[in-house]
Amino acid sequence: MALKDLFNNFFVVEEEEEVEGPEERESSRSRERVQEREDYNRNENQATPQTFNNKQQAIKSVPQKNTLRSNTTSEERNYRMNNNSKNNSRNVVTMNQASQSYTAQESSKMCLFEPRVFSDTQDIADELKNRRATLVNLQRIDQVSAKRIIDFLSGTVYAIGGDIQRVGTDIFLCTPDNVEVAGSITDHIENMEQHYE
């Protein structure tokens, strides 16, 4: 029975809802606020002096913050900002200068490889990923493995946006995108191959 009585008035069903105007809403809100303030004041007055002393001690134990911001004027702030911007302008490096110096350092190195097994191809690909040109000599490896290596390097070069060129009999030049190859010797190679046949 007690449980039934507990939930008896829990749900309120009204057949007609009253629509309050804006003035009525404001007056009801203000009445609620006044009621809340009165309840709060009653609770504060009923507090024991001991709890009041504890609150005072807690307030005293909070450290005071020094606010330098409020002491500075807008002129001082503007002066500081101007000085900071002048100092920072000397430290700015444009991206074009940085990338040019980076590419100049990286493009000056070329790696030579003579793979004996297919697993050596990963070292060649790592050098290409590090933006270094590689010259690959496949004369001392069987033709099947050489074809697999060239296929792998072609995919690597394509992925990094570079280029692969044949520069001799079973010798290939693989270059990343930061290296340009000027000239062509493939015509000369083809003429040499026809001459030997």
Swiss-Prot record:
Entry coiled-coil feature ranges: none
Annotated HAMAP family: SepF
Annotated stretches, region: Disordered: 15-89
BP-aspect Gene Ontology terms: division septum assembly; FtsZ-dependent cytokinesis
Subunit details: Homodimer. Interacts with FtsZ.
Keywords: Cell cycle, Cell division, Cytoplasm, Septation
Polar residues compositional bias, start-end: 43-73
Keyword Oxidoreductase belongs to the record: no
Function noted in UniProt: Cell division protein that is part of the divisome complex and is recruited early to the Z-ring. Probably stimulates Z-ring formation, perhaps through the cross-linking of FtsZ protofilaments. Its function overlaps with FtsA.
Ranges of biased composition (kind: Low complexity): 80-89
InterPro entries: Cell_div_SepF, Cell_div_SepF/SepF-rel, SepF-like_sf
Subcellular localization(s) per the UniProt record: Cytoplasm
Main location as per UniProt: cytoplasm
UniProt record similarity statement: Belongs to the SepF family.
Protein name (Swiss-Prot/TrEMBL): Cell division protein SepF
Keyword Cytoplasm in annotation: yes
Source organism (scientific name): Staphylococcus epidermidis (strain ATCC 35984 / DSM 28319 / BCRC 17069 / CCUG 31568 / BM 3577 / RP62A)
Biased composition (Basic and acidic residues): 22-42
Upper taxonomic lineage: Bacteria, Bacillati, Bacillota, Bacilli, Bacillales
The gene coding this protein: sepF
